[in-house]
Structure formats: structure tokens, C-alpha cells
């Protein structure tokens, strides 16, 4: 018999992450900061590779969960500098090590998506224990998709929650031509949402870019049709 050996025995069949949003208070000496927070679990930063100014990410799978990542505004408010990797802030009187400082995007789209103020990234456990958490409300996974919508179906089956309370988005073909056409034809009703769901900033951004790309697709199709119309007119 033939036995195949994996080139990478430690490889995983899937990678996932979950997160919760909320509020948290950070303290450094006399400086206190109340900030929006995202409590992360799993490989969150693999899905969301934020722009690091200094330092590195931490993993929600780490044994120790006393880490945090802050943006440049938080770094200046707490320390007066953004060179603060390895320094300590207190969250609920518990010391947490700053592993990285990220640049918060400040473009028009980002602000409209919800990135209007300081955001701090901590472990889900930290947010639950020492902050105000809205509970896990985002789950993301990368997994094999041997046939169309296999992964989508597995996630939908495994969620086990009424679809009125969740929205499942399959991202691999999000900006494909068929999806762009679908977005064009849903113009006017697309912004209507009967579900009690608040999108995270990254989903708001993705939906915003869907609209932009759909508009550009309409423009492209019109340009493709123009020579045909011109030929017909000439005849």
C-alpha cells in the first residue's frame, strides 16, 4: 500500500476566530482611558492584519491572556509615546502587557464604518472579566470548500441559531461578477435590514466596498455597450 506523509504534520484543516465588542478602562499611573474594545479569540489578527506601528500581534490561543494591543491615540493618551511595546497597563487592577501599537485607519470610509474613536484589542477573557462586553457576536472561519457552498452549509448547520438573529457571509466570492450583479439589482433594498444585527466595522467596510465596486461595474458595462450603440446608430 502507498502511505502519504503530510509535508506539514502540524497543518490545520481550518483556522477560525471569534470576537466580542464592548468597552474597557485602561490605567497607567494617573492616566486613565475609557475606550471601545474588541475581545478576541482564536486567530483574529490572521483575519484582520491591522497596520502595526511597533510590536506584534498576540493570539487568542495563547495560554496567557494578559496582553493587549492599543492604537496610536491610546498610546499617546496613556504613555505620551507610541514606543510602548512591553510596557504595562492595568485593566481591572490586573497588569496587561502591551504587545503592539496599531495605526487606526482614519479615511472617510473607515470613519463611516465606525472607526471614529480609540479601539483597544484584548483577549475575550479580559473583556468579559474586566470590561463591558456584548458577548461573542462575530465568528470567522477559513476551511476547505471542495464543492460550491460546502463551507457555507457546514457553518450554517453548525451555528444552530435562528437565522433571524444571525447573518452568514461567504467571503471567497464576495467581489465576483455574479455577486456584483446581485448587488446592483438589490439597489434600494440592500440597505434595509430587518435583523437586530449591528455590523462590526470590518463588515461595514466590506459592504461599502461592495457598493463602490458594483457602481464601477455598472460604469464598465455602459462603456462596453457604448461602441455597440454607436455601430447601430451609424447603420
Question: What positions do the PLM features span?
Answer:
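N-terminal membrane-entry
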Residues: 206-226
Amino acid at each position: 500500500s502507498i502511505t502519504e506523509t503530510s509535508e506539514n504534520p502540524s497543518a490545520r484543516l481550518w483556522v477560525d476566530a471569534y470576537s466580542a465588542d464592548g468597552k474597557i478602562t485602561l490605567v497607567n499611573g494617573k492616566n486613565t482611558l475609557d475606550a471601545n474594545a474588541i475581545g478576541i479569540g482564536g486567530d483574529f489578527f490572521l483575519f484582520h492584519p491591522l497596520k502595526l506601528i511597533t510590536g506584534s500581534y498576540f493570539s487568542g490561543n495563547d495560554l496567557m491572556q494578559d496582553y493587549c494591543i492599543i492604537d496610536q491615540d491610546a498610546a499617546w493618551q496613556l504613555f505620551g509615546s507610541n514606543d510602548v511595546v512591553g510596557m504595562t497597563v492595568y485593566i481591572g487592577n490586573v497588569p496587561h502587557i502591551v504587545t503592539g501599537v496599531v495605526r487606526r485607519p482614519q479615511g472617510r470610509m473607515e470613519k463611516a464604518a465606525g472607526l471614529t474613536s480609540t479601539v483597544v484589542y484584548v483577549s475575550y477573557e479580559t473583556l468579559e472579566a474586566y470590561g463591558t462586553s456584548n458577548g461573542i457576536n462575530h465568528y470567522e472561519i477559513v476551511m476547505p470548500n471542495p464543492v460550491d457552498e460546502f463551507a457555507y452549509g457546514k457553518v450554517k448547520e453548525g451555528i444552530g441559531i435562528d437565522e433571524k438573529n444571525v447573518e452568514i457571509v461567504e467571503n471567497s466570492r464576495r467581489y465576483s461578477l455574479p455577486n456584483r450583479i446581485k448587488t446592483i439589482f438589490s439597489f434600494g433594498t440592500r440597505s434595509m435590514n430587518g435583523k437586530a444585527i449591528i455590523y462590526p466595522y470590518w463588515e461595514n467596510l466590506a459592504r461599502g466596498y461592495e457598493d463602490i465596486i458594483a457602481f464601477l461595474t455598472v460604469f464598465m458595462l455602459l462603456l462596453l455597450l457604448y461602441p455597440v450603440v454607436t455601430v447601430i446608430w451609424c447603420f
